[in-house]
């Protein structure tokens, strides 16, 4: 899916404490992972109120593969998120990325990031997201996925959801949150934030954060780290001092190859260590 949202990039969300930075695409750095040896396609995921679209990838064959839920940035399940799914499949996972604000609107219809946030993202309730991720996990379990070895990872908007879903689903063995919001003013749609749930995590979460993030302060990261330690959690937070928000997004100028590679290696080790691989 080639979406018009790839014509611009966002350094962070304007809502919930995220600073916004619009920059041009940096296509020359974008990583492309082929689908050789994989089963990979767009899908429809049955939900309690119908269905939502998504994308999945897994190794070809009839084995059962550890499931990883891949949670989108604000731009939805665009080519970068699909590529991340294929990267996981090359490692032996069944990776699935549901479109988590499909009901609120198609973000590819908007050219301006303010419209994406104001008309779509800000209207997505956390309860809906949790149900849809449950549905994605159930779908994966019927399609060669091993949900007893299930991990979750997400980026930016999806980083916050990674913390929440790890607290929501007792089947999650481990999570990796890439620069997700940790604190914020609660409201009807978002009644809790990750820092409120440190004592409810069903599996350990590895947080990967940026020292030069203009939307997530180091003070916020430090408060989260302190809360985790106070609760005796084995979750960890790693800060890349010289990186910006979006350092894993290889199609943006914010991409930091060294930090992204290190984070990806740490993710794999984290999943292996905690039973999600």
Feature locations, PLM:
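The feature captures the conserved acid-bearing segment of alpha/beta-hydrolase catalytic domains
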Residues: 185-231, 236
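N-terminal cap/lid segment of alpha/beta-hydrolase-fold proteins
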Residues: 29-60
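Gly/Ser-rich "nucleophile elbow"/oxyanion-hole loop immediately N-terminal to the catalytic nucleophile
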Residues: 111-151, 276
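C-terminal catalytic histidine-bearing segment of alpha/beta-hydrolase fold enzymes
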Residues: 234-277
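Short beta-strand element of the alpha/beta-hydrolase
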Residues: 65-73
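Short amphipathic alpha-helix adjacent to the substrate-entry channel of hydrolases
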Residues: 79-98, 102-103
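Primarily recognizes the serine-hydrolase "nucleophile elbow" in alpha/beta-hydrolase
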Residues: 138-194
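N-terminal secretory signal peptides and thylakoid transit peptides that target proteins
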Residues: 1-16
